[in-house]
A protein has these predicted regions:
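Charged, terminal alpha-helix-loop-beta segments
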Residues: 1-186
Length: 186
């Protein structure tokens, strides 16, 4: 899926540019939970039988991503994705679509995720872009250009709805003169 690949390219570029920004992005998406998955370097860490000079460690985490274009998420498929997250300390299911997930399905998925200690992150492509912009410095021209390119791709591919730009107009047949007289067209 090209749309998933491009979204993951954006996130991988964010990580390569600044792991700290990537982890801030992740933390911002799950406001109520403090996620500590950044790389840690510890000197002289004591354990039961030894004290190594240093340790480099990182908590295990996995983000399973499912992208749809017409909000046609299948509950069964999403629940099967949860199995792929077993064994990780921090588990995320990211659902990505041009529109918000239907509320009944979101409640079911959120409930199942909670039971399995998985964090469900439901995003639109627009919200994904906004969340990335939030953690990237305005002076970081390279990342700003990457975000702008991705945003342009999303608009060109109809991943960000622009129906708010349209107005439904009912044509006036017999009432045109009356509408004009009442200044409806000014």
């Amino acid at each position: 899926n090209v749309d998933t690949a491009n979204a993951m390219l954006l996130l991988s570029r964010l990580y390569l540019n600044s792991p700290k920004s990537f982890f801030s992005f992740l933390n911002n998406l799950v406001e109520d939970i403090d996620i500590d998955v950044e790389l840690k370097v510890v000197l002289q860490e004591k354990n039961k039988s030894s004290v190594p000079d240093a340790a480099i460690m990182q908590e295990s985490f996995k983000i399973a991503v499912e992208t749809k274009l017409h909000n046609n998420f299948a509950e069964k498929q999403l629940l099967h994705h949860l199995a792929s997250l077993e064994g990780y300390n921090y588990k995320f299911l990211m659902t990505l679509d041009p529109r918000e997930m239907e509320s009944n399905l979101k409640q079911k998925i959120d409930s199942e995720c909670k039971n399995k200690n998985v964090i469900h992150i439901n995003l639109t492509f627009k919200k994904l872009i906004e969340a990335v912009k939030e953690v990237v410095d305005d002076r970081d021209i390279d990342m700003q250009n990457i975000i702008a390119d991705y945003e342009r791709y999303c608009y060109d591919s109809d991943l960000i709805p622009d129906d708010w730009k349209r107005m439904r107009v009912v044509l006036s047949g017999t009432s045109f003169e009356s509408n004009k007289a009442n200044n409806l067209y000014s």
